[in-house]
Amino acid sequence: AGYIVLCDRYKFTAFARDTVRGCSPDWVRRLYSFAALPDLTFFFKAPLDVSLGRILGGRPRLKYHEAGMDLGLSSDIEESFKLFQGRLLKVYSVMKSEFGLIQINANQPIEKQQEQVRQRLAGSIDLGQYELDKLS
């Protein structure tokens, strides 16, 4: 309590991935129950082709597990990625209502996404109560 923590991914990523891979949603939630629920969680949603393009724009190929190749959805890694991500999106859709995830359209310009995040933060957290530590 009394701290602001920003992180990329959290227990919700494990909830989605483990559930899609066949684990019981209740079991996964109990497994990660030690991790506190955040006050705010943003879910950045982009079309699958946009997500794929962003990944491949930064490296030459998809990773085996991020494409869901372990599930045997398709022998084509890009097709498997799309099928796997589609399943993840369904789980995130359920978690949106269950945990109050705030969906941001990740197909917008980054400045617009940042503006929306800042507006939600400003409406939920009084940043003025936190003092930044000075680095020596």
Language model features: what each stretch is:
Residues 2-4:
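Loop/turn-to-beta-strand initiation segments
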Residues 6, 40-42, 102-104:
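Hydrophobic/aromatic beta-strand patches that form the interior of the parallel beta-sheet core
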Residues 9:
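Walker B catalytic acidic pair
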Residues 12-13, 110:
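Conserved beta-strand edge residues that scaffold enzyme active sites
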Residues 56-136:
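NTP-dependent small-molecule kinase module
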